[in-house]
């Protein structure tokens, strides 16, 4: 399942929130959203998840369980502010090397400054590039992680194929993403929170409601857990599975390059 489709005029289109846009138009629109929220990105995630993103990210790192060896290489995509990469490096006893890739320079600038303050620059590399066209050789990384970023990629299936390409044989893909709530009653509460509260809190925090409105809508347009797992299999991964967090508000997807 992919959100990309043929438009009425014969071109390719995809979704930007609840809007239909040309596939080539989505990335600049997404970039604008994250330029606006870069300095308040962690606060944004607190608003989007009621603070639970921190628990989910810790669970993601526990699932990865990075070894304490210096030649362990991780690619963290859409990881500009470094939140996942920092956790991976610390969990490895500051042995692992993480490449933080993001298409948004504002997000990377925030991450690099945070890494400097934490004394982690020796374990990290920051690369501005597109998830659909990774600037790395095949079989380069032991793990590929992406947290709350895959739904913003215009062509998700292309990004997944690139993930498969750059992973070493035996390498692991981990995708943490907002998902479809599967717990009765929680889905109603979460819808009310998402569409009524989140944009208003976003406006209070940043002075701009629009980025938060897009982010809420983008969650609803993202494939459900089973459909996204099928996309991961189609990209070539084996042993594909997912784990729901907080009743399905988020899900951690796992796949291996076998």
From Swiss-Prot:
Catalytic activity from the UniProt record: a 2-demethylmenaquinol + S-adenosyl-L-methionine = a menaquinol + S-adenosyl-L-homocysteine + H(+); a 2-methoxy-6-(all-trans-polyprenyl)benzene-1,4-diol + S-adenosyl-L-methionine = a 5-methoxy-2-methyl-3-(all-trans-polyprenyl)benzene-1,4-diol + S-adenosyl-L-homocysteine + H(+)
GO molecular function annotations of the record: 2-methoxy-6-polyprenyl-1,4-benzoquinol methyltransferase activity; demethylmenaquinone methyltransferase activity
Alphabetized Gene3D superfamilies for the sequence: Vaccinia Virus protein VP39
Positions of S-adenosyl-L-methionine binding: 81, 102, 130-131
Keyword Transferase: yes
CDD domains: AdoMet_MTases
Entries under InterPro entries matching the protein: SAM-dependent_MTases_sf (IPR029063), UbiE/COQ5_MeTrFase (IPR004033), UbiE/COQ5_MeTrFase_CS (IPR023576)
Keywords: Menaquinone biosynthesis, Methyltransferase, S-adenosyl-L-methionine, Transferase, Ubiquinone biosynthesis
Job description of the protein: Methyltransferase required for the conversion of demethylmenaquinol (DMKH2) to menaquinol (MKH2) and the conversion of 2-polyprenyl-6-methoxy-1,4-benzoquinol (DDMQH2) to 2-polyprenyl-3-methyl-6-methoxy-1,4-benzoquinol (DMQH2).
Descriptive protein name: Ubiquinone/menaquinone biosynthesis C-methyltransferase UbiE
Organism in which the protein naturally occurs: Sinorhizobium fredii (strain NBRC 101917 / NGR234)
